[in-house]
Amino acid sequence: MKRLFLCTLLCAISCALAYAIDIPKEHIYIFERSTNSNYVCYDINLQEDGKLNQREPVRGYWVLDEETRLGELTFFERKVAFGIRVVSIKEQEAVVYMTAYKDLKIRVCKHKGKWMGIVKLNGHEMVLQKMFAQMKQSIYPRCEYVDIYGTDIKTGEKRRERIKA
């Protein structure tokens, strides 16, 4: 009976801890896919002195199982799809891109006192909030398009731009 009680107690504690993970609420942006509810968060990576980390200014990680677990990107995911490559970096600004799409440069900087990712699409500069990939399921999943969501820097209006794969 004691063993059953202890097992039940440990299970309850571990379930409670799983829901108590601390996922930062402010991200540079998130990347979602149509395949499931897991998504990749991209957060600013600062050194202890408050300056951008020169080797890895933006850090990506998975948020899994409807926000109950965090997961590291695998080597393959970093190299082929969700990894971040640095184009240029200064003390308080970096230009990066995702390994899956080199043409979309993301300028990471402080804007109105907050760290943000700024992209330029179709002549509009916008604060990046989210990317969403519509996937076609098959033996080898394929991306049909990526929607990029953000806010126009000049007008403040919400924008969505689509990149066909």
Question: Where in the sequence are the language-model features?
Answer:
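N-terminal export/targeting and maturation segments
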Residues: 18-77, 158
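Extracytoplasmic electrostatic interaction patches
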Residues: 103-165
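Sec-dependent N-terminal signal peptides
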Residues: 1-16
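Generic structural motif
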Residues: 4, 33, 49, 151-153
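Amphipathic, non-transmembrane alpha-helical stretches in extra-cytosolic proteins
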Residues: 38, 76-84, 89-93, 140, ...
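Ser/Thr- (and often Asn-) enriched beta-sheet segments in non-cytosolic proteins
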Residues: 27-30, 43-45, 63, 88, ...
